[in-house]
């Protein structure tokens, strides 16, 4: 009879734990508020509307990877550089807003899911794929 381990949950192998997800969501809300309210005094960040679609936490909650996307997708490199330049300030602001034992180190990445979804949509609209989809529906009828 197999023994069940009580230490780590099996969800850690397949994805983030419930706590990682909860803390990531708290930090995402805090970062979105800070950026929306213009809390960072930086010309590059002030000139862009930045969305924060996701924050992924490390298992020890000491590292937060913040996925960002400037509205319109323009100047992503400049926005990432400005966020990296101001990450100490942002870390302090997050620490004030989210009650954690340690303020996590922030790493910023561009969220490329929107670009990937657009690429797939374009691919699905190509004539060759449309022809295949239509022939499959004709075969099933």
From Swiss-Prot:
GO biological process: maturation of SSU-rRNA
Keywords associated with the record: Cytoplasm, Ribosome biogenesis
Localization, UniProt: Cytoplasm
GO molecular function: ribosomal small subunit binding
Record's GO cellular component terms: cytosol
Disulfide bonds: none
InterPro entries found in the cross-reference section: KH_dom-like_a/b, RbfA, RbfA_dom_sf, Ribosome-bd_factorA_CS
Subcellular location, principal: cytoplasm
Gene3D superfamilies registered for this protein in UniProt: 3.30.300.20
KW Cytoplasm (keyword) present: yes
Homology family: Belongs to the RbfA family.
NCBIfam families to which the protein is assigned, alphabetical: PRK00521.2-5, rbfA
Quaternary structure and partners: Monomer. Binds 30S ribosomal subunits, but not 50S ribosomal subunits or 70S ribosomes.
Name this polypeptide is given: Ribosome-binding factor A
Annotated organism of origin: Afipia carboxidovorans (strain ATCC 49405 / DSM 1227 / KCTC 32145 / OM5) (Oligotropha carboxidovorans)
Gene: rbfA
């Amino acid at each position: 009879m197999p023994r069940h381990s009580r230490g780590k949950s099996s969800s850690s192998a397949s994805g983030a734990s419930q706590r990682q997800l909860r803390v990531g969501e708290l930090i995402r809300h805090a970062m979105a508020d800070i950026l929306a309210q213009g809390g960072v005094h930086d010309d590059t960040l002030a000139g862009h509307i930045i969305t924060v679609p996701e924050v992924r936490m490390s298992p020890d909650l000491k590292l937060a990877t913040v996925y960002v996307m400037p509205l319109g997708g323009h100047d992503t490199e400049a926005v990432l550089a400005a966020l990296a330049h101001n990450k100490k300030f942002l870390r302090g602001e997050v620490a004030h807003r989210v009650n954690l034992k340690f303020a996590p180190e922030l790493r910023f990445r561009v969220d490329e899911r929107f670009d990937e979804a657009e690429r797939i949509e374009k691919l699905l609209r190509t004539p060759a794929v449309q022809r295949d989809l239509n022939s499959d529906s004709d075969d099933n009828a």
